[in-house]
């Protein structure tokens, strides 16, 4: 293995990085830069024999300011660079910026698990990523949606808390147990608010009686249009309300000019897989999420 050196990028390095990355990788990195999810000084460059051989980037939500995830954009030929050293370099940077935890995502069959485990990350959960190219007309008769802005903030936090009850998503359950239901709901809303979004995208499902029964929060997460949060009250589940909310979200996003919408679901959350499939979301890939507590 070549002796490696690492440093943080500068604005002047971006053209060099672009020339070294694949077209797909550069597009992803440029999206993170465009939406202020990363910045040049959060990009870690690894050099071997004087040549750029590896690139990592710390990223966060647009308005959050503290790194939440690590993205890898370039790996040199096998054995050329000490990737573990690069990860430690990135971790120390995140720690110095005040991060409490970091996430890293790899494909389901990734060979990187030993490396990221060596960097201190622990397997967090398995995730299924879905993609939709257009809404399905599966509205529930007699139900409507309203903008989240029509409700008091306390009402929205309470609705998120209620729709998170008995969740099959292990991440939601982890933070509910650690923080408590209402604190987790408040954190969820705050995280969504740190992303790029239009308040008109966020919808609450309303029953004929006027009672709110569910909520969906589409956002631009790391530059991509995704379902940031969706939930239905436990007593209303299994009656296509999730499909109704997904359809409402898609209508709004389509009007905003988006041609694709993504959603991610815990592999254990079978009911959400069904709702996504019923709403014409197709499985795109399976991933592993790893988490490091700092």
Positions of the model-derived regions?
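Hydrophobic adenine-recognition pocket in adenosine-nucleotide-binding enzymes
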Residues: 9, 73, 230-232, 265
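Conserved active-site alpha-helix within GNAT-family acetyltransferase domains
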Residues: 108-125, 243, 267-285
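Conserved donor-binding loop and adjoining core beta-sheet/short helix segment
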Residues: 21, 30-92, 212-225, 233
